[in-house]
């Protein structure tokens, strides 16, 4: 939400962008409010209103303080910002989330924005290549949950190892979640008790020991580029972050998502709805091993994933986004100028008729003349 205020101060065009759908629709709920089962179009619609309402009330005071003290702008309200009229660029694939029919013309689903062939200097070590190329008929899966911080990393390792052994697969395990917790404990310094430091070290050693116990079945890495690895293996298991989900689907790999929070549940359910994989809410040996058996043996799922991957690889997300920017540039300029004019017009009234900070709480629902739908803005709580 900071960009819109900076654009107003600089008097430049402004576009919004996000890797998950945030624009109001009746087609599906807000990604942060995904229910356990469908609740209907009205529920879907209201999740966006309530989310925007909650966010604005949480940030309004600091936002207006930033506007006044840093940008030299007067306070504003969600109604005056009219964020629903600003051009939006969504960096996900329309093959995964098609644009809803109730989205307006300036809301674009461009396709994923991939950075191909980045000059990182990374190269796989010989041990990793040997593991992938080993003459072993068992399919290889990738398992990694990003930088998620968990309370018991050893338990996650235990579940992964037991599930892999039960599923007749081999696994490349990326330990980002546990190493981050271990590093944090190591950095606590001399002020922490030696006993705690020794415990953290022991925990880290336990994780390494159990992963190294089955060298022909499990290979542990700290990190590996997804665009290099995923096309070489059978399936991927991850937390459902937008970027990792995109990488797995682009490679045409069946996907298991274990969501932890936020939009990860949305992507997990979308993958399962499309027949591209499984979403498991609880990380248990029973759940993970069952899902691993499906993604490693279901040839129809692999076929569907390959078809979707082919479509995604044909997309030109970055190029499409650039074209959308040029197409809607004048509209973006007009939106910024309209915001400036509204601020200038109401500045005197606001400063003389409202108490300081009252704008922060303004929340309304008005009939949006441009869309013919109810928009966040002019419903005010009863005094």
Model-derived regions, located:
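Nucleotide-sugar-dependent glycosyltransferase catalytic domains
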Residues: 1-170, 182-204, 210-213, 303, ...
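Short, well-ordered beta-strand core segments
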Residues: 14, 88-89, 236-237, 255, ...
């Amino acid at each position: 939400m900071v960009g819109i205020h900076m654009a107003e101060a600089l008097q430049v065009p402004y576009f919004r962008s996000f890797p998950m759908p945030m624009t109001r629709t009746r087609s599906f709920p807000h990604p942060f409010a995904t229910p356990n089962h469908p609740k209907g179009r009205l529920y879907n619609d209201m999740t966006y209103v309530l989310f925007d309402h909650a966010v604005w009330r949480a940030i309004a005071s600091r936002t207006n303080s930033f506007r006044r003290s840093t940008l030299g702008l007067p306070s504003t309200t969600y109604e005056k910002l009219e964020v629903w009229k600003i051009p939006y660029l969504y960096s996900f694939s329309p093959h995964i989330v098609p644009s809803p029919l109730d989205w307006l013309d300036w809301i674009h689903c461009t396709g994923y924005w991939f950075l191909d062939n980045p000059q990182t200097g990374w190269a796989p070590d010989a041990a990793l290549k040997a593991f992938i190329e080993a003459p072993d008929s068992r399919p290889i899966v990738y398992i990694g949950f990003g930088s998620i911080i968990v309370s018991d990393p050893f338990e996650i390792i235990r579940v992964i190892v037991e599930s892999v052994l039960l599923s007749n697969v081999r696994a490349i395990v990326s330990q980002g979640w546990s190493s981050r917790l271990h590093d944090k404990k190591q950095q606590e310094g001399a002020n922490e008790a030696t006993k705690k430091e020794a415990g953290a070290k022991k925990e880290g050693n336990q994780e390494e020991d159990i992963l190294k116990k089955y060298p022909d079945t499990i290979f542990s890495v700290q990190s590996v580029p997804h665009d290099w690895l995923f096309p070489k293996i059978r399936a991927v298991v991850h937390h459902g972050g937008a970027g990792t989900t995109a990488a797995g689907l682009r490679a045409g790999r069946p996907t298991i998502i274990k969501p932890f929070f936020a939009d990860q549940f949305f992507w997990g359910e979308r993958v399962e709805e499309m027949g591209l994989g499984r979403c498991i809410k609880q990380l248990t040996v029973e759940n993970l091993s069952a899902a691993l058996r499906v993604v490693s043996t279901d040839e129809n799922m692999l076929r569907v994933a390959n078809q979707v991957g082919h479509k995604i690889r044909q997309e030109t997300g970055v190029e499409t986004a650039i074209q959308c920017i040029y197409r809607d540039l004048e509209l973006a300029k007009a939106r910024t100028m309209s915001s400036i004019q509204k601020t200038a017009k109401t500045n005197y009234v606001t400063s003389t008729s409202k108490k300081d900070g009252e704008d922060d709480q303004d929340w309304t629902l008005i009939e949006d003349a441009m869309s013919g739908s109810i928009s966040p803005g002019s419903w005010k709580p009863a005094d």
